């Protein structure tokens, strides 16, 4: 199963409604699960990103979930494929 790291940055709307972020995160986790995507971790951060998601599942399902999340207008996302050492070794030979 493929794994992805999604970097989260709040929009002005998302920052304005920061107190609602945990409830939105729970709703995302439930929707992702229903779509066949596993949310391995959901973390809020300080710095250039406001949060990080670690997701696993079929590429199209993961990207669909992330696109739906961004379409709500509270966050902007950047999704990166992620690999463990043995996966990278298999890719690079």
What are these regions, as identified by a protein language model?
Residues 1-93:
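A compositional/biophysical signature of low hydrophobicity enriched in polar/charged and small residues
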């Amino acid at each position: 199963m493929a794994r992805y790291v999604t970097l989260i940055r709040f929009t002005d709307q998302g920052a304005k409604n920061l107190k609602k972020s945990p409830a939105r995160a729970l709703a995302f986790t439930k929707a992702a699960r229903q779509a066949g995507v596993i949310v391995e971790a959901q973390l809020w951060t300080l710095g250039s990103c406001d949060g990080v998601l670690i997701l696993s599942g079929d590429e199209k399902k993961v990207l669909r979930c992330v696109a739906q999340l961004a379409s709500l207008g509270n966050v902007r996302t950047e999704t990166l494929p992620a690999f463990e050492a043995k996966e990278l070794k298999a890719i690079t030979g």
